[in-house]
From Swiss-Prot:
GO terms for biological process: DNA repair; DNA replication; negative regulation of DNA-templated transcription; proteolysis; SOS response. Its EC number is 3.4.21.88. The lineage of its organism: Bacteria, Bacillati, Bacillota, Bacilli, Bacillales. The gene is lexA. This is LexA repressor. InterPro entries: ArsR-like_HTH (IPR011991), LexA (IPR006200), LexA-like (IPR039418), LexA/Signal_pep-like_sf (IPR036286), LexA_DNA-bd_dom (IPR006199), LexA_repressor (IPR050077), Peptidase_S24_LexA (IPR006197), Peptidase_S24_S26A/B/C (IPR015927). It comes from Bacillus cereus (strain ATCC 14579 / DSM 31 / CCUG 7414 / JCM 2152 / NBRC 15305 / NCIMB 9373 / NCTC 2599 / NRRL B-3711).
């Protein structure tokens, strides 16, 4: 199969994660929120390229009909599970100091968290990301990386070494950490350290 771009891989990973969690694929809107794309037409474009490259098949008459093909299909049926560490707690409202101790581990499909030593989970406390579908008490799946594209949801350390989950923007002479809550103001910083990118969300419905 033809190699995927980083964005296409992120979208494919998110689709596989949702199929594993729910038994059916995510909506275009959910995909856009997960990978930091505001335009549904841009998401459709990436899905078309995934289809052209043979990774997925879509039914144009059904909005959620995304079938994973080839080896990736087997990954969603029978695969190994990796115990991903849940690391402390990060506030999605007012930033709190990042806790580096591992509280527990959470099982996730190996295909979703390729490079398990670079993936961790954090529990959200606060309501600043509710418009991105991330709520108080959710667990976010984070891939460790030190850079991000504008619009991606990241775990970042502020100038005061505080950890927070926000949408990332690098602007002319500063960084903007944007909450997904219209009642809250962005955090404007001269310096920021990206810890990782949020690639998925887990919510207990009980």
């Amino acid at each position: 199969m033809e190699k995927l771009t980083k964005r296409q891989q992120d979208i494919l990973d998110f689709i596989k994660l949702k199929v594993q969690e729910k038994g059916y694929p995510p909506s275009v809107r959910e995909i856009g929120q997960a990978v930091g794309l505001a335009s549904s037409s841009t998401v459709h474009g990436h899905l078309s390229r995934l289809e052209e490259k043979g990774y997925i098949r879509r039914d144009p008459t059904k909005p959620r009909a995304i079938e994973i093909l080839g080896e990736d299909r087997m990954d969603t049926e029978t695969q190994s599970v990796i115990q991903v560490p849940i690391v402390g707690k990060v506030t999605a409202g007012l930033p709190i100091t990042a806790v580096e101790s591992v509280e527990e581990h959470f099982p996730l499909p190996a295909s979703i968290v390729a490079g398990a030593d670079q993936v961790f989970m954090l529990r959200i406390s606060g309501d600043s990301m509710i418009e991105a579908g991330i709520f108080d008490g959710d667990l976010v799946v984070v891939r460790q990386q030190q850079s991000a594209y504008n619009g991606e949801i990241v775990v970042a350390l502020t100038e005061d070494n505080e950890a927070t989950v926000k949408r990332f923007y690098k602007e002319k002479d500063h960084f903007r950490l944007q909450p997904e809550n219209s009642s809250l103001e962005p955090i404007i910083l001269k310096q920021v350290s990206v810890i990782g990118k949020v690639i998925g969300v887990y919510r207990d419905l009980h």
